[in-house]
């Protein structure tokens, strides 16, 4: 009899938790992820598209949610805005030249359960990475920005799908 109850409780948790570690309420079946809004002063014009694609990849491939193109028809809505982009020296060498630069991107996220009209997550995220501006130049900054976006997508996904 005890084994039956333990099995029942274990299976009951599966309605909310997936084996990828993503906890999604069982009544949510679809998610809309509109194009990320970019309010930053980044020299790269496609940060919004890159972050949108990274988020879609995570939420669709690592959960049971399906992508809904119409935000009003989706069970869940993930809205993201890039608020700030900085590229600042962190180490200065001879002749006052930057030897290391840090790219920092700050975003604001709002994740809403539209079925129950409940905000599941609303907060800012910030991530940074460093590169060598002398050796890597603008291409190094661009690659570093891509890495920062990947880190942000991971952080957003983890926060939105974790219960802790």
Question: Which residues are covered by each model-predicted region?
Answer:
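Second-shell loop/turn segments in exported
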Residues: 37-45, 135-145
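Surface-exposed short loop/turn segments
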Residues: 19, 61-63, 72-120, 128-140, ...
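A structural "domain/chain start" motif
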Residues: 8, 14-64, 69, 87, ...
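Bacterial N-terminal signal peptides that target proteins for export
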Residues: 1-6
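Compositionally biased, intrinsically disordered linkers/stalks adjacent to structured regions
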Residues: 141-164
């Amino acid at each position: 009899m005890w084994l039956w109850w333990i099995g029942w409780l274990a299976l009951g948790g599966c309605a909310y938790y997936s084996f990828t570690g993503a906890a999604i309420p069982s009544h949510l079946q679809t998610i809309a992820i509109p194009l990320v809004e970019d309010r930053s002063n980044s020299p790269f014009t496609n940060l919004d598209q890159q972050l949108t694609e990274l988020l879609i990849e995570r939420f669709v491939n690592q959960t049971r949610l399906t992508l809904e193109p119409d935000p009003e028809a989706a069970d869940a809505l993930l809205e993201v805005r890039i608020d700030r982009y900085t590229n600042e020296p962190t180490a200065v060498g001879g002749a006052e030249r930057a030897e290391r630069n840090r790219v920092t991107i700050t975003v604001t996220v709002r994740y809403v359960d539209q079925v129950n009209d409940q905000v599941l997550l609303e907060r800012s995220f910030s991530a940074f990475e460093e590169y060598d501006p002398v050796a890597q130049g603008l291409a190094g900054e661009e690659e570093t920005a891509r890495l920062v976006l990947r880190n942000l997508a991971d952080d957003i996904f983890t926060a939105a799908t974790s219960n802790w």
